[in-house]
Amino acid sequence: MAKELATQLIEQLQAAGVQRIYGIVGDSLNPIVDAVRKTGGSGQGGIDWIHVRHEEAAAFAAAAEAQLTGNLAVCAGSCGPGNLHLINGLYDANRSGAPVLAIASHIPSKQIGSGFFQETHPDRLFNECSVYSELVSTAEQAPRVMHSAIQHAIGLGGVAVVTLPGDIAGLEATGETPLPATFRRATLIPDAASVRELAEAINAADKVAIFAGAGTEGAHDEVVALAEVIGAPIGHSLRGKDFMQYDNPYDIGMTGLLGYGAAAEGIEDADLLILLGTDFPYDQFLPGTRTAQVDRAAHKLGRRTDVDIAVHGDVLPTLAALKPLLTPKKSRRFLNQMLKKHDRLMNKAVGAYTRKVEKKQPIHPEYAASLLDQVAAEDAVFTADTGMCNVWTARYINPLGTRRLIGSYLHGSMANALPHAIGAQLAYPGRQVISVSGDGGLSMLLGELITLAAHRLPVNVVVFNNSTLGMVKLEMLVDGLPDFGVDVPDADYAAVARALGFHAVRVTDPARIEDAYREAFAHPGPSLVELITDPKALSIPPKITGSQVLGFATAMSKVVLNRGAGEAVSMARSNLRNIPRR
């Protein structure tokens, strides 16, 4: 019996190790969906179809699976609006370097260019959020396009899009199925002269600081050993937190708007800053000091700040080559100074809201986040929504070397946490997965609670309900504007979840938080814990500029004029202990 092209393409994905496809069915996608059905699902060694409520969630779920496992993940959308819905999640995946393949089905091939019903041009639309995007025009061409898409997604680390007209997908396959060219990613060895230049700069410097990013994955011990030899404090980016914060006696926290601890000051006070595997984009937090950068991606060298020494290579072999060239530093003055400052800041600012607040209502979000860190499993996977939940998880969730924490850190989309958790739970069915959302983010893709219920995924959803878009509110105040348009209508998310069959509870008393977590995490199916948190609690960055102070003061004066002094006083009380003290 003749094989359909759609079946051939699905066989290629199976050969590449794909276990599931996230998406929503639609007429132009029917041949692909039917080919998935014929595989028998994962129970028979085939591919599962994960039916989500919105294609954006399909792309986010695939992004999380790919980001966490490093393996190819797949999503699909029907022609026109269906695959257009993928685009936000695909931006997130591509910016995160996640190997995701998207099948964008298309209108009948003879109608392309005629302004047909639901016509778009996916091969053009997805160019900006992909490393590969091609239109299939014939059955003969299709297997090679699919092969190229697989290799691009895995090899370059990003999104590959195959635009496939439904009528072509239903044609007879014309040749053998090409197998993926499996490979192991090569290690990039740095140029010896560049390493010597870096060693000379380190040996000549009095105060060296390290700032580590996601590129330090797998190099934790080596980075810590470098810090020991040269007496350097280690700051990290949010994406580097998983890989550098744990078991690190030289950790001084994180810089940036979400940052904490002494990282901002340590980076600024150094006379040599070493950027290890980071493409940290916020140049206002990068000083004008002498800077060295190590990265395997040459195009990232020097694009955020001026770099005096650029080393093109992976972090691990770079440190191996660097080690014998270094002269150990006897002085620990700078390192000890930063460690003491970090300890003081963590105690006075970050730790302030985790003490003596067991009876304070509304719930302090920092306290709730610190309890979440204590109760969660040692190998839990956390997915954090963009906004204030990013702050609370960044500051209070400890990675332990066994946990993972992901979010839309480079794209900055709201509503990512819940669909990310879907992909994480399917990738790791035996691990505890915790989605941490604000009410704003959760409500944006609220329908994905149905996806959890339908697939009986034991994701633990934690909702910080403060009835406001907290991060946007903070940004307005810093810019000198009174908060406006940031209110989120009150909704009982626990009641919604219970109606879907979740174990769900709404918590207003902080004394109930820990028990609520434990009960939810012990439940075998999906759960939701809704926390009613203080809407006036704001994230204070580790480094406050004069313009930010002026903007906040201006905004507060407008708040007083518009809503009375009581509102401003209440906001001050909610945040006073968060202000960093030097």
Where do the language-model regions lie?
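Generic beta-strand/beta-sheet core signal
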Residues: 24, 103, 163-165, 211-213, ...
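Active-site nucleophile and cofactor-binding loops and adjacent substrate-binding regions
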Residues: 24-27, 49-60, 75-81, 137-138, ...
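Catalytic phosphate/nucleotide-handling subdomain of diverse soluble enzymes
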Residues: 416, 420-457, 464
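A general structural motif
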Residues: 2, 54, 114-116, 185-197, ...
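Active-site diphosphate/adenylate-binding microenvironment
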Residues: 6, 14, 27, 32-37, ...
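Phosphate/pyrophosphate-binding active-site segments
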Residues: 140, 163-164, 175-177, 200, ...
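Thiamine diphosphate
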Residues: 118, 285, 454-546
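N-terminal alpha/beta PP-like core and its mobile active-site loop of ThDP/TPP-dependent enzymes
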Residues: 1-333, 371, 375-378, 458-461, ...
